[in-house]
Curated annotation (Swiss-Prot):
<protein>
    <recommendedName>
        <fullName>SsrA-binding protein</fullName>
    </recommendedName>
</protein>
<dbReference type="InterPro" id="IPR023620">
    <property type="entry name" value="SmpB"/>
</dbReference>
<dbReference type="InterPro" id="IPR020081">
    <property type="entry name" value="SsrA-bd_prot_CS"/>
</dbReference>
<comment type="similarity">
    <text>Belongs to the SmpB family.</text>
</comment>
<keyword id="KW-0694">RNA-binding</keyword>
<dbReference type="GO" id="GO:0003723">
    <property type="term" value="F:RNA binding"/>
</dbReference>
<dbReference type="Pfam" id="PF01668">
    <property type="entry name" value="SmpB"/>
</dbReference>
<dbReference type="GO" id="GO:0070929">
    <property type="term" value="P:trans-translation"/>
</dbReference>
<keyword id="KW-0963">Cytoplasm</keyword>
<dbReference type="GO" id="GO:0005829">
    <property type="term" value="C:cytosol"/>
</dbReference>
<comment type="function">
    <text>Required for rescue of stalled ribosomes mediated by trans-translation. Binds to transfer-messenger RNA (tmRNA), required for stable association of tmRNA with ribosomes. tmRNA and SmpB together mimic tRNA shape, replacing the anticodon stem-loop with SmpB. tmRNA is encoded by the ssrA gene; the 2 termini fold to resemble tRNA(Ala) and it encodes a 'tag peptide', a short internal open reading frame. During trans-translation Ala-aminoacylated tmRNA acts like a tRNA, entering the A-site of stalled ribosomes, displacing the stalled mRNA.</text>
</comment>
<dbReference type="InterPro" id="IPR000037">
    <property type="entry name" value="SsrA-bd_prot"/>
</dbReference>
């Protein structure tokens, strides 16, 4: 069987910096035709976007999809609210997470899978400033250690 081809269109790198990612879900997204064309061209921004559960449905807010140049009257508002498509049991799990204090839903990736636009939705918990500093210090120490071993291996 052929390997599933996934083409990542946009990533929310800031989410990994600002949040602890607990769990991720794959969700479909309701889009218009011109929005899909714009997404395929890579004109999308996930930076300040987030999701909420309302009336047992999940909606994505602040995801900016630039208007398609040739779409004229068919273009929608770039920041409009978009519905996410998830199974009922997944939505119930998300409701359980979000009702806990400090948890939120953040889109981390937007990608094409078998020709369909999908969103990777993460259940996330906000990081405090000292957590961010800790991560930066850990990353710096790791890169310094790798650099040291590489120099030792090469005999420099």
């Amino acid at each position: 069987m052929a390997k599933e081809e996934i083409k990542i269109i946009a990533q929310n790198k800031k989410a990994y910096h600002d949040y602890f990612i607990e769990e991720t879900y794959e969700a479909g997204i309701v889009l218009s035709g011109t929005e899909v064309k714009s997404i395929r061209m890579g004109k999308v921004n996930l930076k300040d976007s987030f999701a909420r559960v309302e009336n047992n449905e999940v909606y994505l807010y602040n995801m900016h999809i630039s208007p398609y140049e040739k779409g004229n009257i068919f273009n929608k508002d770039p920041l409009r609210t978009r519905k996410l498509l998830l199974n009922r049991h997944e939505i119930n799990k998300l409701i359980g997470y979000v009702t806990r204090k400090g948890y939120t839903l953040i889109p981390t990736k937007l990608y094409l899978k078998r020709g369909l636009v999908k969103v990777e939705l993460a259940v996330a918990r906000g990081k405090k400033l000292y957590d961010k500093r800790e991560d930066i210090a850990r990353r710096d120490a790791k890169s310094e250690l790798e650099k040291h071993f590489k120099e030792k291996q090469l005999g420099i």
